[in-house]
């Protein structure tokens, strides 16, 4: 990655000696208007530097950014104070994730299926019922401080990303 005053030029090329497909996830963060013209910044986080914690009900959460269960992720100094979790749920497990009160966010299915809702931070809090999320699907979380996740019969892997909303327009190219 090459940081330049005008922006960032991508030059990453993940190594994969086994020739198997690999997955990389990038999170681009919208900055508050006051920070829009600051120098671009890039943080690379390698897998071995990501802490993980056990989840009540089965599974684990890897903390990429933010603080979860008193464990801080390695990506830091981000303006919107994101919580960025890589969650692995065991088959049929149910867990509740506590979010900071002022955060809004989404979940994204990486593997398997899971349901978000069950009367907390998900769709059911609006009386619409829980929402099934499959691989490569995204579900926007409703307001609240808890997210209830229920894994499908084969388990699930998902990203949960939440941050302080800016309540500002998004400015493209700047």
Go through each PLM region and give its residues:
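Jelly-roll (double-stranded beta-helix
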Residues: 1-174
């Amino acid at each position: 990655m090459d940081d330049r005053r005008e922006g960032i030029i991508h030059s990453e090329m993940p190594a994969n000696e086994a020739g198997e497909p690999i997955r990389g996830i990038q999170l681009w963060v919208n900055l508050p208007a006051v920070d829009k013209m600051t120098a671009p910044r890039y943080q690379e986080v390698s897998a071995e530097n990501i802490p993980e914690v056990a989840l009540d009900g089965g599974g684990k959460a890897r903390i990429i950014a933010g603080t979860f269960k008193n464990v801080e992720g390695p990506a830091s100094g981000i303006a919107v104070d994101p919580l960025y979790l890589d969650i692995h749920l065991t088959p049929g497990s149910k867990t509740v994730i506590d979010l900071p009160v002022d955060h809004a966010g989404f979940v994204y299915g990486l593997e398997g299926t899971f349901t978000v809702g069950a009367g907390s931070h998900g769709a059911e809090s609006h009386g619409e019922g829980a929402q099934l999320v499959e691989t490569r699907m995204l579900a926007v979380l409703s307001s609240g401080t808890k997210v209830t996740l229920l894994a499908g019969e084969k388990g699930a892997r998902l990203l949960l990303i939440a941050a302080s909303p800016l309540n500002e327009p998004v400015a493209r190219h700047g």
